[in-house]
């Protein structure tokens, strides 16, 4: 397996891991813990009873960005697998790179907005759903860089293929 294929495989594996972490983070209700309960983007649970969170701008922005980040990550995974299974043109690889970096940016916005809302409350502690989001962030960016390097290798190979090599 060449360097390009290895980078694409690594990018797909990291993207798969980040997609799983992002979906788990988005759908579970353990973003914060407080005395007697926990809450997420969609519901808050107190003493075993869960109810929907009333509409708050910061939580709505975080939820929307998380859903978009998860969607873009999954779409990038599908394109990345298609690129690896078939020798696809460079345009698909560039779309994957853009989707991965955009997904990472949306994830960063969601987590930063949620952090700014809850970081100042001394009785609130961040929990595992929240940390899954932060854990997915570097994996998305590293996956994007893997596809970027693989695309650069492909473009440089195409660029020098017409030159005669004298060694």
Curated annotation (Swiss-Prot):
It is a multi-pass membrane protein. Its main location: membrane. Belongs to the PMP-22/EMP/MP20 family. GO terms for cellular component: membrane. It is found in: Membrane. It comes from Mus musculus (Mouse). Keywords: Membrane, Transmembrane, Transmembrane helix. This is Claudin domain-containing protein 2. The chain crosses the membrane at residues 13-32, 61-81, 96-116, 130-150. The keyword Nucleotide-binding does not apply. The keyword Transmembrane helix applies. The lineage of its organism: Eukaryota, Metazoa, Chordata, Craniata, Vertebrata. Pfam families: PMP22_Claudin. It comes from the Eukaryota. InterPro entries: PMP-22/EMP/MP20-like, PMP22/EMP/MP20/Claudin.
């Amino acid at each position: 397996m060449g360097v390009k294929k290895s980078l694409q495989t690594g990018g797909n594996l990291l993207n798969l891991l980040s997609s799983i972490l992002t979906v788990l983070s988005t759908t579970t209700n353990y973003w914060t813990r407080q005395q007697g309960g926990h809450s997420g983007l969609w519901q808050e649970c107190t003493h075993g009873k869960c109810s929907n969170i009333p509409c708050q701008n910061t939580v709505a922005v975080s939820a929307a960005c998380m859903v978009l980040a998860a969607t873009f990550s999954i779409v990038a995974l599908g394109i990345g697998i298609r690129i690896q299974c078939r020798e696809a043109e460079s345009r698909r690889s560039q779309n994957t790179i853009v989707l991965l970096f955009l997904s990472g940016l949306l994830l960063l916005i969601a987590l930063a907005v949620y952090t700014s809302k809850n970081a100042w409350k001394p009785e609130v502690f961040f929990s595992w759903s929240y940390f899954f989001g932060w854990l997915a962030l570097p994996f998305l960016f590293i996956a994007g860089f893997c596809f970027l390097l693989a695309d650069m290798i492909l473009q440089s190979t195409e660029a020098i293929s017409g030159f005669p090599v004298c060694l």
